[in-house]
């Protein structure tokens, strides 16, 4: 059963440009190489919620866990952490529509 890796974070102040360059040039291509399919990206405009939410699809829970245990995932995540704060994630059964 397909699952969705839902990640949330806030962009670190004064790192917006570097963050966007990293996401477009390294993070998205990197997660695609690992086997995750970008499904959605949301930005919070109002309220006390994470600034960014991203959804990635994996074939199943074991695939998601294998990807997240890989060295390549760790490297992408560590680089992401230089640009963001308050990172969180969860793996849930994928369904249509917005999931939080």
Question: What name fits each language-model region?
Answer:
Residues 43-48, 82-83:
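A short beta-turn/loop motif at secondary-structure boundaries
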Residues 92-100:
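Short, low-order "capping/linker" segments at domain edges
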Residues 3-10:
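Active-site-flanking beta-strand signature of metal-NTP-handling nucleotidyl enzymes
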Residues 24-39, 57-92:
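An amphipathic, aromatic/His-enriched active-site/gating alpha helix that lines ligand/cofactor pockets
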Residues 53-55:
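Charged, often glycine-rich, active-site loop that binds/positions anionic groups
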Residues 1-3, 48-50:
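Residue-level preference for beta-strand/loop junctions
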Residues 10-22:
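Short, surface-exposed ligand-recognition loops at beta-strand->loop->(often short) alpha-helix junctions
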Residues 15, 62-64, 97:
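Residue-level signal for secondary-structure boundary sites
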